[in-house]
Amino acid sequence: MQIRRKHPNPAVKVESLSYVVKVPEAQPQNILEEIVWHKEIEVDKLRERLPLLELRQKIANTAPPCDFLAALKQGKTQPALIAEVKKASPSKGVILEDFDPVAIARTYEQGGATCLSVLTDSKFFQGSYENLTLVRQAVSLPLLCKEFILYPYQIYYARSKGADAVLLIAAILSDQDLAYFVKIVKGLGMTALVEVHSLAEFDRVLAIEGIELIGINNRNLETFTVDLDNTRQLLEARGEQVREKGILIVSESGLHTATDLAKVKQAGANAVLIGESLVKLPDPALGIQKLFENLG
């Protein structure tokens, strides 16, 4: 299913009156499309408050980003762990009521995480860019900004808030946008984690030059259902191409146990992104150690 961009139902103005005619096409087809439509409005407002020129000047005065990709290659664990600072999601609602992003990030670092991911979407995941900045100030690990990026502006904004890497979701970006965004990310010294869910998306991304890190999401973002076998299926189909290109693979979503990790590691994943199952633990640092103690 194609994810539509701009809300197709603009206001109609007649003299001093303004009204909206509701049509069936004006309703989002699924959760992902609803998120994208809201993000369009959010980014427009952000641009008004902070123009791109000012944003780029701000970035020019910041320290260079950490090397997210190199950290994953060196991995403190096998597979390398990207631990996610996550309060809520559309499928689960609030995961942790007493949410302290800094405390969570520090326990992840103590537990042996290689990198961290911070949710910045506010409406659907109750995240924020403030959380990203706070975590950046509290830990030394490379940080991924977990966001629904539609425009180059968001990449610059994420960098200004402390991100070392950004998520680019193939389902909501054209091939042209993906290729262009990857160049912008690299130009800023950052890493692009390009996310796919289906074999069709995987093929699209593998055909784009310059992509070094691909995330296979076991969650269908249209329905938010999870199939852990998705990583194995996609790597069975295209694993040879991935290895030939020297691309690192991150398995995302639905990972809860050491058995789950062993399964995706055997399938060919170099890293895993885990959030919900760690956030809920009373001691995430200990939880990380137990998850990885027998994987080697």
Swiss-Prot record:
Record-given protein name: Indole-3-glycerol phosphate synthase
Record-stated family: Belongs to the TrpC family.
Species of the source: Microcystis aeruginosa (strain NIES-843 / IAM M-2473)
Catalytic reactions on record: 1-(2-carboxyphenylamino)-1-deoxy-D-ribulose 5-phosphate + H(+) = (1S,2R)-1-C-(indol-3-yl)glycerol 3-phosphate + CO2 + H2O
UniProt keyword terms in alphabetical order: Amino-acid biosynthesis, Aromatic amino acid biosynthesis, Decarboxylase, Lyase, Tryptophan biosynthesis
Recorded metabolic or biological pathway in which this protein acts: Amino-acid biosynthesis; L-tryptophan biosynthesis; L-tryptophan from chorismate: step 4/5
GO biological process per UniProt: L-tryptophan biosynthetic process
Gene Ontology molecular function: indole-3-glycerol-phosphate synthase activity; phosphoribosylanthranilate isomerase activity
EC numbers, comma separated: 4.1.1.48
Cross-referenced Pfam families: IGPS
